[in-house]
């Protein structure tokens, strides 16, 4: 793997993905400049000037600053303002690479196999925001623009509590009871936050341009995910059914593109990743 030179500036450095990128890059001995909203509030009118004063020619920039998930128009607008502030800030800076941490929500939620060549057809505000955010960032003049589109991310430290591994793990540790909608038939690919950070660091080392879908390559039903969490949870944990699962969809990822770029990458499977997360969450709760 080629050696990285220069500074890595991470926006959203205290967020779920951003903090893991900072940790992973720091472990590799890189010069990391972590920036959170406390350092530069990209939603404020003068933020582009503040960020421009920090940036230097040759910097590599990871854009992980966002309000996620975007649940309303205000969230969408704020995210686009944040990205526009970034674009304005780098107008006079020779950025070596811009990595935009986006989402697989840009593809919508229909059943099927997803690849980097799949068409973008978002069917949620979060998906529409993610795609618009990518388009705003495309205005940055850089020799390497990398769009990272992870599948649903899970891991210790997640704050979103979305339906799936993160919520199931919290439920099993708090009450010993995991709630699944209907039969839990819908299938999704879930990827660990550590794997997402690893791919981002790899993409910087090799200056990968274009779209990178990040997934485990293993799609699992929500019922099976709940069972995996139950089995590594406290004794007596159980799965209960609530309501119904309307129009379940079945999504899989072809990660051959990811494998071609990083032949030695071994994604973390759900059985291993979920056990690691539950153990880490239990340890954090008892710390």
Give the positions of each predicted feature:
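Active-site Tyr-X1-5-Lys
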Residues: 121-146
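NAD(P)H-binding glycine-rich loop region in Rossmannoid oxidoreductase-like domains
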Residues: 45-81
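N-terminal Rossmann NAD(P)H-binding glycine-rich loop of SDR-like oxidoreductase domains
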Residues: 4-26
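Adenosine-cofactor binding site in Rossmann-like domains, unifying the SAM/SAH pocket
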Residues: 32-50
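SDR active-site strand-loop-helix element
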Residues: 11, 35, 61-65, 98-104, ...
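C-terminal substrate-binding subdomain of Rossmann-fold SDR/epimerase-dehydratase oxidoreductases
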Residues: 176, 181-184, 188-287
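Flexible, glycine-rich beta-alpha linker
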Residues: 107-108, 124, 148-163
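Conserved Rossmann-fold NAD(P)-dependent oxidoreductase catalytic core, especially the SDR/UDP-sugar
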Residues: 85-125
């Amino acid at each position: 793997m080629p050696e990285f030179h220069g500074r890595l500036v991470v926006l959203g450095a205290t967020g779920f993905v951003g903090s893991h990128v900072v940790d992973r890059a720091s472990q590799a001995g890189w010069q990391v400049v972590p920036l959170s909203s406390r350092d530069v509030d990209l939603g404020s009118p003068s933020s582009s000037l503040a960020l421009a004063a920090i940036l230097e020619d040759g910097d590599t920039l990871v854009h992980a600053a966002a309000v996620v998930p975007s649940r309303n128009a205000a969230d969408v607008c704020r995210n686009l303002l944040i990205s526009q502030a970034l674009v304005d800030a780098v107008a006079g800076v020779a950025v070596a690479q811009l990595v935009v941490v986006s989402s697989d929500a840009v593809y919508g939620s229909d059943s099927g196999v997803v690849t980097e060549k799949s068409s973008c057809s978002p069917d949620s505000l979060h998906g529409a925001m993610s795609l618009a955010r990518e388009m705003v960032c495309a205005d940055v003049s850089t020799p390497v623009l990398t769009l990272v589109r992870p599948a649903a991310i899970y891991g210790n430290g997640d704050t979103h509590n979305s339906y799936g591994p993160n919520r199931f793990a919290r439920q099993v540790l708090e009450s010993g009871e995991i709630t699944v909608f209907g039969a839990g038939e819908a299938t999704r690919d879930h990827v660990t936050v550590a794997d997402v950070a690893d791919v981002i660091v790899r993409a910087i080392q090799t200056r990968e341009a274009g779209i990178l879908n990040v997934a485990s390559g293993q799609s699992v039903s929500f019922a099976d995910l709940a069972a995996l969490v139950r089995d590594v949870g406290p004794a007596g944990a159980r799965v209960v059914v609530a309501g119904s699962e309307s129009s379940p969809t079945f999504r899989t990822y072809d990660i051959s593109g990811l494998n071609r770029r990083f032949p030695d990458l071994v994604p973390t499977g759900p059985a291993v990743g979920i056990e690691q997360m539950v153990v880490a969450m239990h340890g954090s709760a008892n710390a």
